[in-house]
Amino acid sequence: MLRRTSILASIIALAAVLRLWGIGSAPPALQYDEAVNGLTAAGILAGEHPGLLMQKDGREPIHFYLVAASIAVLGKTPGALRLPYVLASIGLVAAVWLLARELFGRKVGWLATLLCAGTLWPVYLGRYGTRSVFFALVTALALFSAARAWRSRAIGWWVVTGLLFGVSYYTYPVNLFVLPAIVLVLAGAALRRSEALRENGRGIAVMIAVTALLALPMWLYRGASLTQSFSRPQHLAVFYAGQGPVDFVKTLAAQTVLVLRMFFLRGDANPLHNIPGRPVFDAAMALPFLLGLAALAQMRYRRRGLVIAAWAALFLLPTFLSKSAPHFLRAVGILPVLFLFPALGLLHTHRWLRQTTNRAVANMVVGGLMAVSVFVTARDFLLRDFLNSPYVYRAYNGEETSLALQINRRLGIGWTGSNLVTRPGPVRDSMHIWVDPDVWDGNPYAQFLVPGPLDEFPGLHTLSSGAELTASAGVLFVHPQNVAAWLEHIPAGKTARVQPGPWLHDPDTKATQRLYHIVSW
């Protein structure tokens, strides 16, 4: 028992290291969605309560409250904002262990868990502060609970399953596929006239009732806010009304290739989701994945295999049906079952090698494949410092976030570039900063990361027509078009120094301009 616990603890520790490394400083910026999430969470701490769907694209609420709890303890830093998502990603590793062990035993459980701990997709998913990872965690736990309930026939486990599936409707929009997935699995069991289905009939009814009861407020809210709920899916859809048959077939073929090749050839190209173009699995896991897929077709695994394959196929639909395929966030629903495939392949490889050679060779080959896969992830993600690369910095809106860093470093408080916990005051008495509304108002990054709003925080002021600049040292953050006007207001006898701010390229207008200038004296 102690040995088994130690193995699992070691895998969880590996997952934690890969996900928590440099959390306070890498990347040294906030992406727009992260900043908006942070502002919403800060609003909760101020007494505001978001609805069931927030923002124009309809964001579910659970993660806002988790982020609020984190920043209440650690302060408003990127690391504090991302910590709940990192913990959810680590929790996903444990949930995969529970599910894999329940379905296929302890050995597959360890293998699947190690793969989840060391594969780039779930590692990076936790470092990007958006809500998709919570769906993967909750549904992995729900599938484990369902498997335990099916085996034990215990009503209590069916209730837990219903609660978890219900909670999934408050996590991420791919939850719209949860009910179809349940129906598909039950329909398959009914077609096979499973005795276990009849024995679990009452429990399944309880699960569905609990799921529906918990999800009902979200369903009603979505029904009353159809434009908010479905405008983005309609915008992203690759199939549309009036599409010609030739175009439909071409799109169908293209999407199929794009989605299927993500596993071994070319994955998500977005640096917010992935090392651009990197497939889900490296070369070391390609053959084990295919062997595991074949193993699930064997008679001894067939029922479980059909459930796993049906779940995976259904939750590939969100990326298959939308633009920018493959999209790792939209495909997040497959993560609970994804690592079962290579884990089974590795198990069968080990058994075959043990029978044809000996245990030492089997251990060396399977262990070597696992070690190579984990090393490749650590090398590409950590050793090559992916999160601090220039294109990742740009993808995370590093230029816009720099305003917050410039302000906080001058005030000597808050997040100053590498700290997980916000630096406390007091503010330097001699420091006064004025920020141009043309710079501040469109910058949610600074609005979240700077410890307080303009004119309400010591030393931080709005640069408006009535502003009185102090005769002592001061700093202005001015929109480039307003610099000349404000240079005339510098206190007499002071020499103004103008430092150009970062460049920002607007892909829509193709224009490049300075975000702000720093005027100091």
Q: Which residue stretches match the model-derived regions?
A:
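Short, solvent-exposed amphipathic alpha-helical segments in soluble enzyme
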Residues: 101, 106, 447-452, 491-495
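Membrane interface segments of multi-pass transport proteins and intramembrane proteases
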Residues: 354-358
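N-terminal secretory/membrane-targeting helices
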Residues: 171, 183-186, 218, 268, ...
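Short beta-strand/turn micro-motifs composed of small residues
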Residues: 104, 435-437, 478-479
